[in-house]
Every structure is written in structure tokens, then in C-alpha cells.
């Protein structure tokens, strides 16, 4: 089953029948319009390309405009691709809505995490801070040792150190689907999803469900 592209609206909470508070993220999923259908014969694999939302005409390049016209759809804010399996049939211009998740219990959500800039080891990797006093005057938030001795005589690749944190593709798996509101084009999932408010997210049925 394919996924859908949505927009993170924000977090809130709802109450179940027992009065228990459930923290949920609201994802707005407008109709995903099929802009291209890829097949094994023409492209070497099966997939569909979709767009969603809208884009100012002045912001659409000529190649993009031609691509959208050929598909017979309104220009969207981006293009995304989903692999399809045997038996899944889609046509150019077809609209796919949030109700495809009506019977789905859990989903995987992919987004771009919030960028935090250059961060130290404590914030980036949850390293423990060193002593505040007891003779420590300079190394409160320093990593500590980053190597061994003359052998190997280098710092191993992948060593957890200070550096750029966030602003990368992140997937949160197996989030519970709390509610599907097809009328308002909303999907409510339990817990947090990556990224800032209004960020694009990709929602797919959970691979580990």
C-alpha cells in the first residue's frame, strides 16, 4: 500500500471513552494528485508520483508547468514518489484521499527534523556532564577522551562528537492512528512526529505493524 503526503498542523490532546488523555499530532492530508505513473516496461520499476497543495503560478517553472498540464492536475507544492506493488492500479490525475487509512491501525511518519545548528556532545548525544567543581575548571561539558593510544593513533570514524544537529530526514515508526477525519482531511496519530509546524510529512502504513 502506498503512502500520502501531508502537513504537520501541530499537537493537541483528545479524550477516549474512559476519559484518558491521549496526546496526538494533527496531520492535514489534502488530496494527493497523481502526476505520473511509472511502470516496469517504461521505467524499470513500478511507482506513482504525486503532488499536493498548491503553488503560485509565478513560482512554477516551465518544465514543471508542462508536467502538471500533461497530468491534467493543478500545480502542487512539490513532487513525491511512492513505490507500488502488483495489483495496485492508478491513473493520471487520480486523487487519493486520507480515507485510505480508515482501516490502518499504525503508521510510519517521515519528516525533516527541526534544525538545531552546531550542538555540543551533551545536547547532541545526551553525554553526561563532568564535575561542576572538585578541581574541574574547564571541562564541564567536554566529551572526555576521544581515542586510545599510539595504536590506533587516530580517532575512529563515526565517533560521537560536537557537530550539526537536526535538519535531517527522520522516520518515527508504528504510531497509532487515533482518528481519520475524511471530511476535514485530517489524520490524528498518537505521539509526536518529526519537524516543525507546517512541515511536509510522508505517512505510510507501518512496516512493523
Curated annotation (Swiss-Prot):
Positions where N5-methylglutamine occurs in the chain: 150
Entries under Pfam families matching the protein: Ribosomal_L3
GO molecular function, one term: rRNA binding
PTM annotation, UniProt: Methylated by PrmB.
Keyword field: Methylation, Ribonucleoprotein, Ribosomal protein, RNA-binding, rRNA-binding
GO cellular component: cytosolic large ribosomal subunit
Gene3D superfamilies: 3.30.160.810, Translation factors (2.40.30.10)
Any one GO BP annotation for this protein: translation
Disulphide-bridged cysteine pairs: none
InterPro entries: Ribosomal_uL3 (IPR000597), Ribosomal_uL3_bac/org-type (IPR019927), Ribosomal_uL3_CS (IPR019926), Transl_B-barrel_sf (IPR009000)
Homology family: Belongs to the universal ribosomal protein uL3 family.
Subunit architecture: Part of the 50S ribosomal subunit. Forms a cluster with proteins L14 and L19.
Functional description taken from the UniProt entry: One of the primary rRNA binding proteins, it binds directly near the 3'-end of the 23S rRNA, where it nucleates assembly of the 50S subunit.
HAMAP family in UniProt: Ribosomal_uL3_B (MF_01325_B)
Protein name: Large ribosomal subunit protein uL3
Species name: Pasteurella multocida (strain Pm70)
Amino acid at each position: 500500500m502506498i503512502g500520502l503526503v501531508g502537513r504537520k498542523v501541530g499537537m493537541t490532546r483528545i479524550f477516549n471513552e474512559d476519559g484518558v488523555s491521549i496526546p496526538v499530532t494533527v496531520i492535514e492530508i489534502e488530496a494527493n494528485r497523481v502526476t505520473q505513473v511509472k511502470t516496469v516496461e517504461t521505467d524499470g520499476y513500478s511507482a506513482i508520483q504525486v503532488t499536493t497543495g498548491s503553488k503560485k503560478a509565478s513560482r512554477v517553472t516551465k518544465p514543471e508547468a508542462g508536467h502538471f498540464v500533461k497530468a491534467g492536475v493543478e500545480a502542487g507544492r512539490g513532487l513525491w514518489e511512492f513505490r507500488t506493488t502488483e495489483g495496485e492500479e492508478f491513473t493520471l490525475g487520480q486523487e487519493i484521499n486520507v480515507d485510505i487509512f480508515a482501516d490502518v491501525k499504525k503508521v510510519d511518519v517521515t519528516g525533516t527534523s527541526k534544525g538545531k545548528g552546531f550542538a555540543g556532545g551533551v545536547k547532541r548525544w545526551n553525554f553526561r556532564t563532568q564535575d561542576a567543581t572538585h578541581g574541574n575548571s574547564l571541562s564541564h561539558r567536554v566529551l572526555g577522551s576521544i581515542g586510545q593510544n599510539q595504536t590506533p593513533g587516530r580517532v575512529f570514524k563515526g565517533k560521537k562528537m560536537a557537530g550539526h544537529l537536526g535538519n535531517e530526514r527522520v522516520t518515527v515508526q508504528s504510531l497509532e492512528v487515533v482518528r481519520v477525519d475524511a471530511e476535514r482531511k485530517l489524520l490524528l496519530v498518537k505521539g509526536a512526529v518529526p519537524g516543525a509546524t507546517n512541515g511536509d510529512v510522508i505517512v505510510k502504513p507501518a512496516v512493523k505493524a
